[in-house]
Amino acid sequence: MDPPVILHSPNCSCQFCSSELPSTHTCGSQDRTVPLHVEATAAGHMEAKNFSLQYVLLVAFVSVLLGFSFCVYLKSMSNDEASDMTYYYQDLNSVEIKLGKNPLDPEVIKAIHSFQEFPYGNIPSIRREAEFDVQNDESSAVVLSGSNNNRRQVASTPCENNVLLKLWKDDLSFTIIAVTVLVGAMLARC
């Protein structure tokens, strides 16, 4: 059987009531002018800066880099570049060529004719003169002249620029990610 519960008045000063701390009250008689520990901690955090300047700069930098890499990715996915290049494929049974806007490099034309002449490779015992001679004119154009005196002009735009541009676009996303991780690690140390 439980002992009877003694009810104390709010102004009681007995030994049981005087030992209680005012912050442990859970009833409505608590004094609201004294802030609780939780309220004091929350107010202290609200007055301080929530984000450091380094964190904000890092987030802005990463956002700009991700946006830039996303734009480059979308641009590289477009099919506009395929029409700029010339595709040539030849084996012993078929020839496939798709002409683009840019002209063929004279070295590529020489390689094609060499393959047509020697499909299994160049045999050193057979020596022939070159069928095509490459000459540079003053107008910065390349002239290919053949044995039958046909002349074909090829503009001086190097084909390597398209290859370098494609490689640069492929490696750009990896470079952006690597630089972002490096800058993030450097800012995290500070």
Curated annotation (Swiss-Prot):
The 2nd transmembrane domain is involved in plasmodesmata targeting. This is Movement protein TGB3. InterPro entries: Viral_beta_CD. Residues 1-52, 188-190 are cytoplasmic. Interacts with movement protein TGB2. TGB1-TGB3-TGB2 complex formation is enhanced by ATP hydrolysis. The modification Phosphotyrosine is found at residues 89, 120. The keyword Transmembrane applies.
